[in-house]
Amino acid sequence: MDPQRSPLLEVKGNIELKRPLIKAPSQLPLSGSRLKRRPDQMEDGLEPEKKRTRGLGATTKITTSHPRVPSLTTVPQTQGQTTAQKVSKKTGPRCSTAIATGLKNQKPVPAVPVQKSGTSGVPPMAGGKKPSKRPAWDLKGQLCDLNAELKRCRERTQTLDQENQQLQDQLRDAQQQVKALGTERTTLEGHLAKVQAQAEQGQQELKNLRACVLELEERLSTQEGLVQELQKKQVELQEERRGLMSQLEEKERRLQTSEAALSSSQAEVASLRQETVAQAALLTEREERLHGLEMERRRLHNQLQELKGNIRVFCRVRPVLPGEPTPPPGLLLFPSGPGGPSDPPTRLSLSRSDERRGTLSGAPAPPTRHDFSFDRVFPPGSGQDEVFEEIAMLVQSALDGYPVCIFAYGQTGSGKTFTMEGGPGGDPQLEGLIPRALRHLFSVAQELSGQGWTYSFVASYVEIYNETVRDLLATGTRKGQGGECEIRRAGPGSEELTVTNARYVPVSCEKEVDALLHLARQNRAVARTAQNERSSRSHSVFQLQISGEHSSRGLQCGAPLSLVDLAGSERLDPGLALGPGERERLRETQAINSSLSTLGLVIMALSNKESHVPYRNSKLTYLLQNSLGGSAKMLMFVNISPLEENVSESLNSLRFASKVNQCVIGTAQANRK
């Protein structure tokens, strides 16, 4: 029998589903080789698609006017299975749009031919009973059976063709309905989105309107409170207005009274102006007289200082310090002056005994007394304030334009540094001449500012150690740097001397001066000697350059004030062995004695009016050249020790001071322009 293609096979050749179709029972006998997929596997494959398709109806419920397609007709089941079993059950009205689109876009697949049944297999009987097996020789019976079977197969094929046609019609209707439902669903979803957007917009507008209403209600409440407050304030302002009106009336009455008084005052002012002009003229005349009196005071002050001598010598004896032996009675005597004990002492008597001298009887010779007379002698009980009171007028001469030089001379440990700088601890009673002199200058300059004078002060502080000039105001990195300090003239043809690489610090108050003195005290060279635990081994020179100006009269003056603390010296026993430290002290002593000898030679040369004064023989005298000349005022403090062991050195110092006191260097000249 020629095998014919079944309509179901044609459908399978044109449509290939991704999921197995609904199993349909068939009455065709099974072929020799059964299909590989079992019915239960086909049902399992359909389950996900069924759930997805049915889920569409559960998720989105769409109401449509299209009629539903009737369900597929159930195909009666037969003993065998054919390719019609692969037709899907999801061809009803619930098929999704995805299945319909997949069916439409599938490419046709070649039809699978129906396998021929084996010759050994005999299909079952229609009644379910097995036909009896014919003998092999009954070919006619076998042919009849085959013809009957063929007839039944043709009838079943015809029935299946009809069923297949019905299924195809139902499938087309379902696909059309799915497509229409998909279109309608898309339209409804778009409409739903618009409606939802409009609803959300309406909700937002409603929310905004409610917030606006709340805000307006709050503003209304605030405005009502403000209106009440303004009404209250209006009442207060009306009360205040009535009060101000009454005050205005009172002010108008007082204004009329004031205008009358003003007229009287204007007449009085005119009279006062005339009187002021007269007073101004009188004040100008008084200022002229005051200026003349000030110049006369300066002249008389200078004349008084000249009468006292341009070189004056004061002697000061320091007190005995704790731990030192008490000097014998009569070692130092201070005879009274011509006016009796009330006059300040000006004489000093020193007693010296020489054990090498004796009488013919072998008894020691009586002590020898040495009498000295100076401009002023300060006993051990004299305080720092008493000492400064004697030199205050001399210091003030520096403001008048006269160069002034004050220096302390004496042996090591005689109190020179104490006299010039003061004692440690910052006790005001122990302040030396330098801080007291500057305080006095600042005070007098402040008083003279009322007469039109303005002063400026520039300080410098150097030491001369072994004929080397060092800056005592060097700080930080400036110490030991910048080269050696040298004494130079300020400019070509200038008589003013300056120290290179040294600091010149403007000062205007006591605190600045105290800071400079503290710094210099730390930098000064000191060493232990036989006479003093800390002995100054250098000459310290504090110089204050004073510049004054009277701008309205065009007057200028300027002069240096030099305050010098000379180095102390002591004699070394030549019989002692000199170690490294003693050799260094010996070189220092030689340099100190050399500079002090040069200072004495300079003073003697000035006193003798010699043509050549050896200023350059020593750095000390060269630096003080402008303060030692004929135009300067000079004061020498000779400091001596009260101890008996220092009598020899004290006697040498007093003899040197006595020679200086006998010198006269001429009349001082003020530096004025």
UniProtKB/Swiss-Prot annotation:
A molecular-function term among this protein's GO annotations: microtubule motor activity
Key words, A-Z: ATP-binding, Cell cycle, Cell division, Coiled coil, Cytoplasm, Cytoskeleton, Endosome, Microtubule, Mitosis, Motor protein, Nucleotide-binding, Nucleus, Phosphoprotein
Domain Kinesin motor: 310-663
Cellular component annotations (GO), alphabetically ordered: centrosome; cytoplasm; early endosome; kinesin complex; membrane; microtubule; microtubule organizing center; mitotic spindle
InterPro entries cross-referenced by the UniProt entry: Kinesin-like_fam, Kinesin_motor_CS, Kinesin_motor_dom, Kinesin_motor_dom_sf, P-loop_NTPase
Residue(s) carrying Phosphoserine: 6, 26, 31, 33
The keyword Isomerase is assigned to this record: no
GO BP term, pick one: mitotic spindle assembly
Stretches with biased composition (Polar residues): 60-86
Ranges for region Disordered: 23-94, 109-136, 325-372
Positions bearing Phosphothreonine: 359
Known function: Minus end-directed microtubule-dependent motor required for bipolar spindle formation. May contribute to movement of early endocytic vesicles. Regulates cilium formation and structure.
Protein name listed in UniProt: Kinesin-like protein KIFC1
Native source species: Homo sapiens (Human)
